[in-house]
Amino acid sequence: MISFLRTTEFDAWLKALRDPIAKARVLARIRSAEAGNPGDCSPVGEGISEMRIHVGPGYRLYYCRRGELTCLLLCAGDKSSQEKDIRTAKALLKNLDSP
C-alpha cells in the first residue's frame, strides 16, 4: 500500500474546493492510488506526475514519489491553471529538496 503525504499547499487547495462532489472524487482517487490503482496519470517533468480526475473542470493533482511506498501531493488545480500549477509543483519540490 502506498502512502500519500500532503503539502500545506495541497491541503489549502482541497479545503478551498467548494464542490462537494469534486472533493469526494478527489479523496476517492487518492484512496484508489494508495491501494495501488493510480488511474489516469502522466509525468510532467522533473520527477513530478499529474493525476487527472475527469470531473468538473478537469482536476489535476501533482505529486512525486518519495521512496518505494510514499508519494507527496504537492499541489492541485484544474485544466485552466495547468501550466501555472506545474510550475508551482516544480518550485515546491525544488524547495523541499534544498538543504
Q: Which role fits each region the language model picked out?
A:
Residues M1-G58, R66-C71, D78-P99:
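Basic, Lys/Arg-enriched alpha-helical interface segments
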